[in-house]
UniProtKB/Swiss-Prot annotation:
Protein name (Swiss-Prot/TrEMBL): Phenylalanine--tRNA ligase alpha subunit A
Enzyme Commission code: 6.1.1.20
NCBIfam families named among the record's database cross-references: pheS, PRK04172.1
Reaction catalyzed: tRNA(Phe) + L-phenylalanine + ATP = L-phenylalanyl-tRNA(Phe) + AMP + diphosphate + H(+)
Length: 498
């Protein structure tokens, strides 16, 4: 039945009923149409002005689930188990092959309709205990299906609901009455005044739909920030609130010297091979270095110094010259600390950076080959591990991450070192979110920093905290070709509680 026909039937019912109203559910049943079709007709008539008045009403109704409908036709699981059993009984293994047996067996046992003989010949065997049964579950479901849910007591309804055979749903309907401009004839209201109407004068005979000045209108199309950019902005704001200065991170390409050697990472370290690092083919080698500093780094690697034995190997300038895609932004920190050491008088500093790094890693749910690293560095006299833990707790607390664990770790350029773990509610496990430590004297003293100056350093990825904040379980749903653009549109503004 077309919507216009439903609208006409609705108006005619109101006309015939005098001052009485019409219930949309009753009208749908009377006309044999879907209730939503009647609702559409009501809303269409409302748009025509004061022809009708419609009051929305809500009521509770019991409906059968898909399993409940099946049981209403075929019988309950326990009844079907009983009916499957012959007088001589049936092997339990054979009965349990039926799809209804798992639930039906336990229910039939509870009702004492059947018994299990575990000592029977050939294996456990099930027998009938009674000659006949009454399938009350099927009867109650059929009553509810016929709209007679009130004939089933509340206890039984709740039991059926517990078995997921029925659901209590809220049904919304309309009580429709005549409006001040009621008429049984439907006149289409125009929405636009066209040049043709003006030229012909036909506009005088037209009815125009009134403007709804309260309507919000269509939301304008605009750009949407990716969750990573939102969280990055919050990270940056937190660093600035804590008094940090942002470091320049425009060099994606670094020499192995600044990325590894300056950080007292030996040239035989496995992180420096092709399985973990992306090497450049052209230009393959860097040529410009602060030579005096380079010689001091070479010496501390190959011979030791500053109270350290070093690594005792033949340090190669060729290995240090190799250009790579930086594996961490700590290379930027090394450059900044070297510039700090060149100053005439030492001044305490707090630096931070947020930018991309690259590692030749296997992709999985929590790892990418290209990701963002957040770096924090504090340089001052007399700093300790306690200072580091305090700064980290304050930093992560500002991120809204309070479930933290610190685990002792090893890093070539920090001692002592700690890994930082946070609990991921989505993955239901502790996830590493950062690494930290006090920079080693073998790193700081060759730069020329005073001996009593200590440097705290920590780094974490941007992606994992973003996953935690937005409840994303797989990093490939956040970055890459599998990203759902609707997620980008719908994701709320990130506010990390201080």
């Amino acid at each position: 039945m077309a919507d216009n026909s439903v609208s006409e039937q609705l108006l005619q019912r109101l006309q015939d009923g005098g001052s009485k109203g019409v219930d949309s559910l009753e009208l749908a049943a009377l006309l044999g149409v879907e209730h939503q079709q009647v609702v559409g007709a009501v809303k269409s008539l409302q748009c025509l002005g004061e022809i009708i008045q419609a009051e929305q009403r809500s009521s509770k109704k019991w409906e059968l689930s898909s399993e409940g409908e099946e049981i209403g036709r075929e019988g309950s699981h326990e009844a079907r188990v009983f009916q499957t059993l012959p007088k001589e009984g049936l092997l339990q293994a054979q009965l349990m092959k039926q799809p209804f047996s798992k639930v039906g067996f336990s229910k039939a046992m509870s009702n004492k309709w059947i018994r299990l003989d575990k000592a029977a010949e050939g294996g456990p065997r099930i027998y009938r205990v009674v000659d006949s049964i009454e399938d009350t579950v099927k009867e109650k479901l059929q009553l509810i299906l016929k709209g007679r849910a009130d004939d089933v007591n509340e206890k039984d309804r709740n039991e059926l609901k517990k078995r997921k055979l029925v659901n209590e749903v809220t049904v919304k309907s309309y009580w429709v009455t005549k409006g001040s401009g009621f008429s049984t004839s439907i006149t289409k209201q125009e929405t636009d005044l066209t040049p043709e109407m003006i030229a012909s004068g036909s506009w005088r005979e037209k009815q125009f739909k009134g403007y709804n000045f309260d309507a919000l209108g269509v939301m304008p199309e605009c750009g949407h920030l990716h969750p990573l950019l939102k969280v990055r902005t919050q990270f940056r704001q937190i660093f600035l609130e804590m008094g940090f200065t942002e470091m320049p991170t425009n060099n994606f390409i670094e020499s192995s010297f600044w990325n590894f050697d300056a950080l007292f990472q030996p040239q035989q370290h496995p992180a420096r091979d092709q399985h973990d690092t992306f090497f450049l083919q052209d230009p393959a080698l860097a040529t410009e270095f602060p030579m005096e500093y380079l010689e001091r780094v070479k010496k501390v690697h190959s011979e030791g110094g500053y109270g350290s034995q070093g690594y005792k190997y033949d340090w190669s300038i060729h290995e240090a010259q190799k250009n790579i895609l930086r594996t961490h932004t700590t290379a930027v920190s090394a450059r900044m600390l070297y510039k700090l050491a060149l100053q005439k008088d030492f001044t305490p500093v707090k630096y931070f950076s947020i930018d991309r790094v690259f590692r030749n890693e296997t992709l999985d749910a929590t790892h990418l080959a290209e990701f963002h690293q957040i770096e924090g560095v504090v340089a001052d006299r007399g700093l300790t591990l306690g200072n580091l833990m305090g700064v980290l707790k304050e930093f992560f607390h500002k991120l809204g991450i309070t479930k933290l664990r610190f685990k002792p770790a090893y890093n070539p350029y920090t001692e002592p070192s700690m890994e930082v773990f946070s609990y991921h509610e989505g993955l239901k496990k502790w996830v590493e979110v950062g690494n930290s430590g006090l920079f080693r004297p073998e790193l700081l003293l060759p730069m020329g920093l005073p001996e009593d100056v200590n440097v705290l350093g920590w780094g974490l990825s941007l992606e994992r905290p973003t996953m935690i904040r937005y409840g994303i379980k797989n990093i490939r749903e956040l970055v890459g070709h599998k990203v759902n653009l609707q997620m980008v549109y719908d994701s709320p503004i990130c506010r990390l509680d201080a």
